[in-house]
Amino acid sequence: MGNSCYNIVATLLLVLNFERTRSLQDPCSNCPAGTFCDNNRNQICSPCPPNSFSSAGGQRTCDICRQCKGVFRTRKECSSTSNAECDCTPGFHCLGAGCSMCEQDCKQGQELTKKGCKDCCFGTFNDQKRGICRPWTNCSLDGKSVLVNGTKERDVVCGPSPADLSPGASSVTPPAPAREPGHSPQIISFFLALTSTALLFLLFFLTLRFSVVKRGRKKLLYIFKQPFMRPVQTTQEEDGCSCRFPEEEEGGCEL
């Protein structure tokens, strides 16, 4: 018992003596984090200059702080004991340790290529804003059937195969495909009625205009012919004129 205690005490003394000797041989080991051992000042611990840091003690130099620029934004400012932390601006996501790179986000149903975001090919899907397009699940490999068809944003939904369904059980049918955007029958009927009304109104207007123009033309023709019409004398006027003679001829009759 006494020997074991003696051995423990001796070991502790050796460790303490080793640390003391090491500190005497390398005074830079006493420099804490946030400082560096300045050889130009007789190995005195000097604080790290601005925009630099030392995360561990005993460093002879300080590391340059990271600058968050471009697609990066600062999540944590740099201090004398820790580096700055960056993340990506909206529309991008981090890649690598410590967010060393930023990658563009894509919409669901797309994947990022060298030329930018591209829609997933038929038979593949991507339900996230990052990553690659993955193939639809092959339901037949598991002896199942497709209940809901897959899209570029969603995987297929598998269900029991038709052989597994009992005769009295109701089969599940896939949902009806979404109708392509277009005109509803009500809107088409409305436009047809509106077009028919407009055509009838136009036909009535043209007929009325043609009638008015025709009447006006006859009246104008009559007015134009009035100055050129010769007045016709009555029978009494012609008889009265035939009975009158000049005075000289009347005088010559008295013989």
From Swiss-Prot:
Per UniProt, which keywords does this protein have? Cell membrane, Disulfide bond, Glycoprotein, Membrane, Receptor, Repeat, Signal, Transmembrane, Transmembrane helix
Per the record, the GO terms for biological process are: apoptotic process; negative regulation of cell population proliferation; regulation of cell population proliferation; regulation of immature T cell proliferation in thymus
SUPFAM superfamilies the UniProt entry points to: Growth factor receptor domain (SSF57184)
Q: Which PROSITE patterns match?
A: TNFR_NGFR_1, TNFR_NGFR_2
Annotated glycosylation sites: 138, 149
Pfam families attached here? TNFR_c6 (PF00020)
Give all cystine bridges in this chain: 28-37, 31-45, 48-62, 65-78, 68-86, 88-94, 99-106, 102-117, 121-133, 139-158
Query: Which GO CC terms are listed, alphabetically?
Result: external side of plasma membrane; plasma membrane
The residues on the Extracellular side of the membrane are: 24-186
Q: Which domain of life is it from?
A: Eukaryota
> What exactly does this protein do?
Receptor for TNFSF9/4-1BBL. Conveys a signal that enhances CD8(+) T-cell survival, cytotoxicity, and mitochondrial activity, thereby promoting immunity against viruses and tumors.
- Disease listed for this protein: Immunodeficiency 109 with lymphoproliferation: An autosomal recessive primary immune disorder characterized by recurrent sinopulmonary infections, susceptibility to infection with Epstein-Barr virus (EBV), persistent EBV viremia, and EBV-induced lymphoproliferation or B-cell lymphoma.
The protein's matches in PANTHER family, at most eight in alphabetical order, are given as: TUMOR NECROSIS FACTOR RECEPTOR SUPERFAMILY MEMBER 9
- Its protein name is Tumor necrosis factor receptor superfamily member 9
Q: Gene encoding this chain?
A: TNFRSF9
